Amino acid sequence: MSPSPSPFTISVSDEALDSLQNKLSAATFPDELEAPNQWQYGAPLADVKRLATRWQDGYDWRGAEAKLNELPNFMTQVEVDGFRPIDIHFVHQKSEAERAIPLLFVHGWPGSFIEVTKLLPLLKSGSPAFHVVAPSLPNFGFSSGIKEPGFSLQHYAEACHKLMKQLGYDEYVTQGGDWGFYVTRAIGIQYPDSCKASHVNLIRAHAPEWKKNPLLALQHKLFPYSDAEKNGLERSAWFENEGSGYNLQQRTKPQTIGYALADSPVALLAWIYEKLHDWTDSYPWTDDEILTWISIYWFSAAGPAASVRIYYEAIHVSPKATVIPTRVRTEQWVPDVKLGLAWFPKELSVPPKTWGRTLGPVVYESETPRGGHFAAWENPDVIAGDLQKMFSKTGPCYRIVKGRSGYDRGARARL
């Protein structure tokens, strides 16, 4: 008998809250240099102290928890080949349109399912409308952790695909950024009969090659980069040279950094806060927004250290991987899934347009003058607008999901 989803309520124990308060009260902070720009060295001491103080005294997790519980949260179990059953937490917002388009939204690190929340009201009743499924990936949020080694991109993709199948969505479309880019690309490689189209806001691609993409290679050779593309290459170079140290640590020795993330809320705060600042386009974070994002990691079912293991497993190919959609493979041509690209100037990887078009049959592109890495949070109107244009009656992906145009109105559907 296959498992069925059940409603889920986020409920952090009083003991966990007390433990957080005790750890914050006992925190030891480092000194810092007398530098004019503290951000060059990492998260500034004054900012981290302010946030830690707010987290200990003034921040209302119970209020944030209640807000998260207003979402249609569910829990189910999926089985991934070679691993023990996994408890998957997910948000499942169903539109009133009976034939709404099933959309799988996949988050990354240091994001979570919370990133979908601003999209939900825009996609529920739009034209077209979407049934939105936003899981906490295994090792993230309120999904369970993976205890065995070798849980690679193939297995993250399998978990998400099996969730969609369990919900009755034999065909669906996807949206993702950060690890959501890689996971949804892996889904397109593994399950092209089910994944009909993808929209991504992280664009990890390489220059077109004559043998693989002759027309794109010719365009790349003949036409100079635009000013926006030159700025994008500068942004990409900045990230590689000045912003990617976390990546090297997490993809080589995730366990080592895990001790700090699991034991010290201040370490977790500084580690993530730096990214929220550096990876956005001057987004006006409130302190409570930041603390809610970080609290989801601190109170996560598997613990904050588990989330960084995806970096290691994605590049160390496991004997359990049979399809092998590695990071390298996901950055190459995927033939069977129509693709939409959203370009933002402060994304971490901003390659020239011809590079992005090497990823697959690109049928839709948008370019926004402002925005960064967390597009669904910074620019929800852009992401929702892209999806509605891409799948509209005049869009390139109209009726791409069999029997689900997104337009007809029916009785309120039930899970």
For each predicted feature, which ranges?
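The serine-hydrolase catalytic nucleophile loop
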Residues: 109-121
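C-terminal subdomain of alpha/beta-hydrolase-fold enzymes, centered on the catalytic histidine
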Residues: 250-415
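Alpha/beta-hydrolase
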Residues: 3-18, 28, 196-296
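Non-catalytic accessory segments flanking enzyme active sites
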Residues: 17-94, 99, 289, 298, ...
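Short beta-strand element of the alpha/beta-hydrolase
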Residues: 100-108
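Conserved hydrolase catalytic core segment
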Residues: 122-129, 167-229
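Active-site loop/oxyanion-hole signature of alpha/beta-hydrolase fold enzymes
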Residues: 97, 137-179, 205
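Glycine-rich "HGGG/HGxG" loop immediately N-terminal to the catalytic nucleophile
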Residues: 63, 114, 128, 137-151, ...
